[in-house]
Amino acid sequence: MEIFDTHAHLNWREEYKDDIDEVLENAKNAGVTHIMLASSTIEDSAISLEVRKAKSGSGVKFSCMVGVHPEDATNFNDEAKWQLEQWLKHKDELGIVAVGEIGMDYHYDDASPAYEAMAFIYQMGLAYRYDLPAVIHERDACEDTLFILKSLYEQKVLREVPGVLHCFSGSVETAKILLDMGFYLGFDGPITFKNARKAPDVIRMCPLDRLLVETDSPYMAPVPHRGHRNEPAYVKYVVEEMARLKEISPEEMARITTENAQRLFGKDT
C-alpha cells in the first residue's frame, strides 16, 4: 500500500525537533511514500524548502507548498509578496507544487476579514499566474470563502483544476459547489471520530477521483491516537475509514488517492 499524505506540518521544528527521523521511518513503514509539506507563513515556507532538501534521502518523497495562512494575513506585506514571487519563479527546482495554505479563518481574530480576503485573493492570483493548484484552508468562514471562489470562477481566473479544500468540514451542499468548480476535497483525522457528522455523508457523495487523504500533522490525530501529536504514519487510519465509507479496500483507496494527488500536484510528485 502506497499513501500520499497531502498535508503535514513537519516544518514545525518544535514539534518534531527530537525525532523527525523516527517520524519519517514510521511513515515509511506505514506505507507513506510521499508527504506534502504544508506552510503557513513566509518563515514556515522557507523551512519547508529546507526540510525537503535535508530529508531527501529518507526514503519518503517530499513536495512543498508556499503561502501565507489567513491567521498571518496582517503580515502579508510587499516583502512577503516579493518572497513568494522569488520562490515561484524557481518552483520546479525547489519542489514547489502548490500555493498554500491560504484561505479564510474567522475562528480566531488574528486578522480582520478584509486583510484575510486581500491575502487570499492575491495568492489565488499567484496560483493562477504560475499554474499551480491552491491548498485552501477554511474555518468558520464558509460563506465568504465560497463568495471569493465563485467570483474568481466566474471571472475565469481559476485553473481548470484549481486546488483542494484541505481538512474539509463542510456540508454536502457546499461540497457539491466546490466539486462543480473543479476542486478536490481533503480529509484527515476527524473523520475517524465518533462525533463525525458531515464528513461521512460528503465522502459517500464525493466521486472517488476527487478525494485526497492528509494528516494535518501535528494536529488532529485520528483514532486510536486522538489527543496525541499527529504524524504522517497515522494517515493509514484515514485511508481505512474512507475505504469503509466508500465500500472498497484500503489498498484501493490508497492507490486512488495517491493517483488523485499526483494528478492535482503533478505526475512527477
Residue ranges of model-derived segments:
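Mid-domain alpha/beta scaffold segments of enzyme catalytic cores
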Residues: 1-269
